């Protein structure tokens, strides 16, 4: 039972209430009739359980005491062991200190002994070396030919021979020239021979890329006067093979990267050697390559493209190679690049302007030749003005208007070609012009573009377009092509603006030339806008003039004053006018853009309103005719809705309200006149329309018009 209690106590978490519940449940289950409650049995069970728990507590207490005693004894044992270990550790520290003192003492004696040995050995070594050199010197001092020593004849002992001859050469430089001239000549000859053999050996090692051997030989040669020959030999042999076929630029950077790693390992002064390596590429390889490519100047366009490509690729190459240059030579590559191209850059600007002029002129000639058109000097509108003056005063048409079959003589393709040529020229200009000449050169190129594209092409087309606009108040509906001229002009101007912002302005911004550029462009745009406005005004006048003449001759008096009742429909003249105006509105909306579109549509609508208003003022209206007039005005209103102009819509709404004055009964005139639409109009306008009624003489003396015509 005690073991069962222990199992329950060891469960986590232990709940006293649950333990008592389980004990009560077990007691009830042990009885025969478990449904009855037996308090006595339960009491006995609790008493027995309490006794068992006390016994269990005593056992556990005894077990704890034994474990605590065992722990105390083990702790004392470990403490004694630690104390003994500490004593032994201290003893070891003392012994180590004594040993360290002895080692330092022995080391000091050894160093002292080594110094003494070195002091004794150094003079001896020098003496041996001096004796060795004297033996070699005696051979060179002896009369007759030099007896070739083994050290100079054995290729395996080349390094040793180089050391000897270098020292002998240094000694010989201090000998007086008189008695020792022959000996000095022999030494110099052998010196040159050994030096040549070293360079040849270095070249052989370079071919097999034996880095260690090259490094050793370079160190030896660094003591010789021909060390630069070693560097030159390395550079010459490294750059002997073609870099990359016909395109020299592709192989230069990989070549430099490869040899930079070798130079770093081989030479003691790698930065100077690498600078000379790159210098040789620029002064020999690149310079010769550029001269070959640029020797033919007959095809100027090809020459300029080649110059730009070579110069830009050389600049990029300089940027890529800058990491291999020392800080002292920071601007060396830039100077080398200028030396290569200086002759070509000097005459660049003149050739560029000449080439662009020729290209633009050729494009213009090809365009007009394709149109079979011979350019002629325009009369600047003088003839046109005379025709208008004579036609107005004499009421005759003295000559037919030449409209060239609707040809605008404007070409977006031509403009794009010219702009592309100018863009390429400006791109070259930004790269090939120096900082002080760039703004002036860019302005010259821009002037050429403006001359050919805007003055000789667009302005010429505008002049022809202005002359081709039909005269106003013609009886035949005018064929209008100037709107197409406007559309193409706008496209060309937008393309020009885009080019200027991307290619011209960056060249002249923040310079005195910028104000010159802005002034020229403003004058040019003002001239273009003036002619566009003039042409649009003439075109609108031609259409509105035709409406005026057409209504004047085709609108019958009986349309608005029929003698018999007729169907209430729009007049034929009105329908014809609307039919002709709708395509014009569509064409205007297609060809004009921006704020100009709204201005043109509003101007068109207001002039149309004035013509129709004046036309209605010439008519007399009875009731049936007034209905017809209202139908006509409604047709006009439908037409002008496409103008999207609030002002024009309002004008025709008022005109519609005025036409209602022709229809309403006399007793309702006061009410209509005081309505929202007509209330703010001048009474004279209202009075003029009321006077158009056929019954006006009857009603003018009645009270119906009181306050209106007074």
Swiss-Prot record:
Component of the exocyst complex involved in the docking of exocytic vesicles with fusion sites on the plasma membrane. It comes from Drosophila melanogaster. The exocyst complex is composed of Sec3/Exoc1, Sec5/Exoc2, Sec6/Exoc3, Sec8/Exoc4, Sec10/Exoc5, Sec15/Exoc6, Exo70/Exoc7 and Exo84/Exoc8. Disulfide bonds: none annotated. This is Exocyst complex component 5. InterPro entries: Sec10-like (IPR009976), Sec10_HB (IPR048627), Sec10_N (IPR048625). Residues 44-96 form a coiled coil. Keywords: Coiled coil, Exocytosis, Protein transport, Transport. GO terms for molecular function: beta-catenin binding. It holds the Pfam family Sec10_HB. GO terms for cellular component: exocyst; presynapse. Belongs to the SEC10 family. GO terms for biological process: exocytosis; Golgi to plasma membrane transport; neurotransmitter secretion; protein transport; symbiont entry into host cell; synaptic vesicle docking; synaptic vesicle targeting; vesicle tethering involved in exocytosis. It comes from the Eukaryota.
């Amino acid at each position: 039972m005690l073991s069962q209690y222990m199992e329950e106590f060891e469960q986590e978490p232990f709940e006293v209430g649950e333990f008592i519940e389980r004990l009560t449940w077990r007691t009830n289950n042990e009885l025969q009739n478990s449904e009855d409650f037996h308090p006595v049995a339960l009491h006995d069970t609790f008493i027995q359980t309490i006794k068992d728990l006390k016994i269990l507590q005593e056992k556990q207490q005894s077990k704890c005491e034994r474990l605590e005693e065992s722990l105390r004894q083990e702790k004392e044992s470990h403490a004694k062991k630690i104390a003994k270990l500490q004593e032994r550790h201290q003893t070891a520290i003392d012994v180590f200190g004594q040993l360290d003192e002895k080692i330092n003492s022995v080391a000091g004696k050894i160093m002292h002994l080594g110094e003494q040995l070195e002091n004794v050995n150094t003079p001896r070594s020098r003496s041996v070396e001096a004796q060795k050199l004297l033996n070699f010197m005696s051979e060179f001092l002896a009369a007759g030919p030099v007896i070739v020593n083994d050290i100079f004849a054995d290729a395996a002992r080349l390094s040793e021979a180089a050391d000897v001859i270098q020292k002998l050469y240094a000694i010989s430089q201090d000998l007086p020239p008189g008695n020792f001239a022959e000996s000095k000549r022999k030494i110099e000859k052998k010196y040159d021979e050994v030096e040549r053999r070293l360079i040849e050996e270095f070249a052989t090692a370079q071919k097999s890329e034996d880095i260690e051997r090259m490094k050793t030989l370079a160190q030896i040669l660094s003591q010789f006067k021909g060390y630069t020959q070693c560097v030159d030999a390395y550079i010459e042999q490294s750059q002997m093979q073609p870099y990359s076929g016909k395109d020299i630029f592709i192989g230069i950077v990989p070549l430099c990267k490869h040899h930079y790693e070798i130079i770093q390992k081989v030479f003691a002064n790698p930065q100077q050697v690498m600078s000379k390596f790159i210098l040789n590429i620029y002064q020999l390889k690149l310079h010769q390559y550029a001269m070959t490519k640029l020797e033919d100047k007959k095809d100027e366009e090809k020459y300029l493209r080649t110059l730009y490509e070579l110069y830009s690729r050389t600049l990029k190459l300089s940027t890529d190679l800058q990491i291999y240059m020392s800080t002292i030579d920071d601007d060396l590559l830039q100077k080398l690049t200028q030396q290569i191209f200086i002759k070509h850059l000097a005459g660049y600007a003149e050739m560029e302007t000449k080439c662009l002029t020729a290209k633009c002129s050729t494009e213009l000639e090809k365009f007009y030749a394709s149109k079979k058109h011979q350019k002629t000097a325009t009369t600047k509108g003088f003839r046109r003005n005379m025709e208008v003056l004579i036609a107005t005063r004499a009421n005759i048409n003295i000559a037919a208007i030449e409209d060239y079959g609707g040809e605008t003589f404007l070409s977006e393709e031509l403009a794009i070609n010219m702009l592309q040529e100018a863009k390429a020229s400006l791109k070259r200009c930004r790269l090939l012009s120096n900082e002080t000449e760039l703004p002036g050169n860019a302005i010259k190129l821009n002037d050429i573009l403006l001359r050919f594209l805007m003055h000789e092409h667009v302005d010429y087309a505008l002049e022809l377009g202005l002359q081709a606009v039909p005269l106003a108040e013609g009886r035949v509906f005018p064929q209008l092509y100037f709107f197409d001229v406007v559309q193409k002009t706008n496209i060309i101007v937008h393309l020009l603006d885009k080019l200027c912002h991307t290619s011209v302005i960056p060249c002249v911004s923040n310079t005195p030339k910028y104000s010159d550029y802005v002034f020229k462009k403003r004058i040019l745009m003002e001239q273009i806008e003036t002619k566009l406005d003039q042409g649009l005004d003439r075109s609108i006048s031609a259409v509105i003039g035709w409406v005026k003449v057409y209504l004047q001759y085709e609108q019958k008096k009986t349309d608005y004053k029929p003698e018999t009742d007729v169907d209430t429909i729009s007049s034929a003249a009105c329908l014809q006018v609307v039919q002709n105006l709708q395509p014009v509105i569509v064409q205007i909306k297609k060809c004009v853009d921006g704020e100009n579109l709204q201005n043109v549509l509003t101007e068109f609508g207001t002039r149309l309103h004035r013509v129709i208003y004046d036309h209605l003022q010439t008519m007399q209206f009875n009731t049936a005719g007034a209905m017809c007039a209202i139908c006509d005005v409604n047709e006009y209103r439908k037409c002008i809705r496409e103008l999207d102009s609030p002002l024009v819509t309002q004008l025709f709404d008022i005109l519609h309200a005025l036409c209602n004055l022709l229809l309403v009964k006399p007793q309702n005139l006061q009410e209509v006149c005081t309505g929202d639409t007509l209330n703010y109009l001048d009474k004279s306008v209202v009075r003029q329309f009321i006077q158009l009624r056929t019954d006006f003489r009857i009603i003018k003396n009645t009270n119906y018009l009181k306050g209106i015509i007074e």
